[in-house]
Amino acid sequence: EPYRRQRQMCIRDRRLAPHVPHLFKAVYTGTQADIKRALKAEEMGQLLDTKCTRKQSELLQKTHHLFVLMFLLRGLPFVDLAYIQKKDLNGNILTYHRRKTGRQITITVTKDAMNIIREYMDTTTESPYLFPILSAEGGEDTIYREYQQALRIFNYQLTKLGELLGLTTELTSYTARHTWATLAYYLEVHPGIIREAMGHSSIKVTETYLKPFNIKKLDETNLSIIGYAKRSFEG
């Protein structure tokens, strides 16, 4: 967009640049949607140790623990975490509909995930929401503004958490989701299963998540095959 504005300024002065219709038609000036950031397995393992922030502020600890919970719940998006209701949790079974796609998701909650839920769940009778991220007051617009504010705070605290732990990958509310999908891919889970687990609207969405890691995995496969051939000859 800045290039378009600069060119328009030059076109106004015909001595600087001629007008060429649809000059930018075939030029992509946005951001690549398929570039996703995921943590390495060892980095996610470090984050799964929920005690590593016990000396930090209460807000940072909560952010850390909720991030871990999102990973434990199959890469749960923050928007779904915020909007999940108490009635969606029945014993250790969580059933909810994704805000983005409307697809129903059913998850068996692990012991570690349940411990985090019990620590941070809203225990009041006034709110229908499982976590005290949104209030039950006001209309949909008010609640959505609350969600946006909560998301900004969450991402800011995640940045601080990443710096504290010395992570090489920037932490955002999407990192848990991308990490879950990527680790599943490296464990050779079929993309169709990953799609169902994450509630994607189509397999193409899942492939978008995994595309940046295809080359690396193919390179690793190539090295494994070469190594296997060498060992077979030496043996």
Located regions from the model:
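Single conserved hydrophobic/aromatic residue that forms the stacking wall/gate
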Residues: 1-7, 11
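DNA/chromatin major-groove-contacting recognition/catalytic segments
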Residues: 18, 106-111, 115, 120, ...
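Conserved tyrosine-mediated DNA breakage-rejoining catalytic core shared by Y-recombinases
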Residues: 19-26, 83-119
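Long, amphipathic, Lys/Arg-enriched alpha-helical "connector/arm" segment
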Residues: 22-62
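Short, basic (Lys/Arg/His-rich) helix/loop patches that form interaction surfaces
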Residues: 52-58, 155-196
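Short, polar N-cap/turn motifs at the start of nucleic acid-interacting alpha helices
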Residues: 87-95, 168-169, 189-208, 234-235
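Catalytic-site neighborhood detector that most strongly recognizes the C-terminal catalytic loop/helix
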Residues: 98-102, 198-223
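C-terminal secondary-structure termini that scaffold catalytic or DNA-interacting sites
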Residues: 125, 133-142, 224-235
